[in-house]
From Swiss-Prot:
Reactions accelerated catalytically: IMP + NH4(+) + NADP(+) = GMP + NADPH + 2 H(+)
Protein name: GMP reductase
Assembly behavior: Homotetramer.
Annotated K(+) binding sites: G181, G183
Signal peptide per UniProt: none
UniProt entry tagged with the keyword Oxidoreductase: yes
Protein source organism: Tolumonas auensis (strain DSM 9187 / NBRC 110442 / TA 4)
One GO molecular-function entry: GMP reductase activity
Pfam families, per database record: IMPDH (PF00478)
Encoding gene (name): guaC
Binding site for NADP(+): 108-131, 216-239
GO terms for cellular component: cytosol; GMP reductase complex
Active site: C186
């Protein structure tokens, strides 16, 4: 047994230190980024935010809505091949450029992935997603995916430490997904005692990835636009959002009424709700590591995305970053014991 003494930080532990700026308006900030990926040597340009590959977030409807903002969606893995075929037939190539095809690591998952990617060459992104990215089996699976799809961009995770980021990049991942337990409907940290504060995970994993020419996506833990900006400031190339994009018109799931108000259900992908829906129940050797919540219906996602992008632009003006790419270079975090004045409660 050993203990690491240095303190690890989450988004709530810091604020940006403001700095002199030559920017006169938020409209001058460029949020688009262009990335060149290590293994494929191909490029992608867009706003580097990704809707999470969850049943009630990463939907086809969400992909259509977010693509208009040049924002990416990781489509959840539970759509059938027929549903994918219909979506591809009714979608333009530019829309498909903002979609990731998600997969698990079973043989059936791999065969399904092959058939989906064969539907269109515009499907360039693969998201290989497991809760625990530390197994040898996972790294071996990433190698197989890389060998099979040499021209596709692979995003793989989840991990939270530099050495495993390096392992996955060397195994064939272009982008590594970072985060264990920070999500709003994730209970892994409570159920298992395992995790890593998200901001420190991003800072450490970004350093490891960038040294090898890879990228990371900070997955989870964001509760407001300021957290998204902090993830970028900490070095995340992409930021993945679940709860912040849940309960919208495009989120999937059923709306229901209570006391004259409209709600939608949102649940973690390791929750009992998800396992009952997709695996027929919780296996005897498993425990639920997610929760199910009922959220007030928020309407179309466009207003939420505009609020997030506006917040990040404002962050950039406060620290003097004319481009999102510059934000991490302009970032100085200060440790704090408070984030906001709570006298009137949450907004």
């Amino acid at each position: 047994m050993r203990i690491e003494e240095d303190l690890k930080l989450g988004f709530k532990d810091v604020l940006f230190r403001p700095k002199r700026s030559t920017l006169s308006s938020r409209s001058q900030v460029e949020l688009h980024r262009e990335f060149r990926f290590r293994h494929t040597q191909t490029s992608w340009r867009g706003v580097p935010i990704i809707a999470a590959n969850m049943d009630t977030v990463g939907t086809f409807a969400m992909a259509k809505a977010l693509a208009s903002f040049d924002v990416m969606t990781a489509i959840h893995k539970h759509y059938t091949e027929q549903e994918w075929q219909t979506f591809v037939q009714n979608s333009s190539d530019p829309l498909l450029q903002y979609c990731m095809v998600s997969t698990g690591t079973s043989n059936n998952d791999f065969l399904k992935l092959q058939r989906i990617l064969a539907l269109s060459p515009a499907l360039r992104f693969i998201c290989v997603d497991v809760a625990n990215g530390y197994s040898e089996h996972f790294a071996d699976f990433v190698k197989i995916v890389r060998e099979t799809f040499p021209q596709h961009v692979i995003c793989a995770g989840n991990v939270v430490t530099g050495e495993m980021v390096e392992e996955l990049i060397l195994s064939g991942a272009d982008i590594v997904k970072v985060g264990i337990g920070p999500g709003s409907v994730c209970t892994t940290r409570v159920k298992t005692g395992v995790g890593y504060p998200q901001l420190s995970a991003i800072i450490e994993c970004a350093d490891a990835a960038h040294g090898l020419g890879g990228q990371i996506v900070g997955d989870g833990g964001c509760t407001c636009p300021g957290d998204v900006a902090k993830a970028f400031g900490g070095g995340a190339d992409f930021v993945m959002l679940g709860g912040m994009l849940a309960a919208h018109e495009e989120s999937g799931g059923n709306k229901f009424e209570r006391d004259g108000k409209t709600f939608m259900r949102f649940y973690g992908m390791s929750s009992s709700t998800a396992m009952e829906q997709h695996a027929g129940g919780i296996a005897h050797y498993r425990a639920s590591e997610g929760k199910t919540v009922e959220l007030p219906f928020r309407g179309p996602v466009s207003a939420t995305i505009q609020d997030i992008l506006g917040g990040v632009r404002s962050t950039c003006t406060y620290v003097g970053a004319a481009k999102l790419k510059e934000l991490t270079k302009r970032t100085t975090f200060i440790r704090v014991s408070e984030q906001e004045n709570p006298v009137y409660g949450q907004e």
